[in-house]
């Protein structure tokens, strides 16, 4: 089971994650999760990205909560088993940023 991060680790990892963004939309903390809305040029690009991320999520054995409408994908990451944010959440978020 993944270990829940302490507050200082979360702050440092969130800052490092937001240094990777290529758009103007940062990841935001929301309680025991991090969230971001990704915007794409079309539905097919949004869905294609989700398909790629699903493969990475399966490899990490860590799955996002996400919602797609047309060209937008809202992502929420948390580790339910740990009761909060873990390294898995930030690893998956980093993959999402790199493949956007």
From Swiss-Prot:
SUPFAM superfamilies: PCD-like (SSF55248). It catalyses: (4aS,6R)-4a-hydroxy-L-erythro-5,6,7,8-tetrahydrobiopterin = (6R)-L-erythro-6,7-dihydrobiopterin + H2O. Its EC number is 4.2.1.96. Keywords: Lyase. GO terms for biological process: tetrahydrobiopterin biosynthetic process. Pfam families: Pterin_4a. One of its GO terms (molecular function) is 4-alpha-hydroxytetrahydrobiopterin dehydratase activity. The keyword Lyase applies. Belongs to the pterin-4-alpha-carbinolamine dehydratase family. NCBIfam families: PRK00823.1-2, PRK00823.1-3. This is Putative pterin-4-alpha-carbinolamine dehydratase. The lineage of its organism: Bacteria, Pseudomonadati, Pseudomonadota, Gammaproteobacteria, Alteromonadales.
């Amino acid at each position: 089971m993944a270990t829940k991060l302490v507050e200082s680790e979360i702050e440092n990892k969130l800052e490092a994650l937001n240094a990777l963004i290529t758009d103007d939309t940062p990841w935001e903390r929301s309680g025991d999760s991090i969230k971001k809305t990704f915007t794409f040029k079309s539905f097919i690009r949004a869905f294609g990205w989700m398909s790629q991320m699903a493969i990475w999520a399966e490899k990490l054995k860590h799955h996002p909560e996400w919602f797609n409408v047309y060209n937008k994908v809202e992502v929420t990451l948390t580790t339910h088993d740990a009761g909060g944010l873990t390294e898995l959440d930030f690893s998956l978020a980093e993959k999402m940023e790199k493949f956007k």
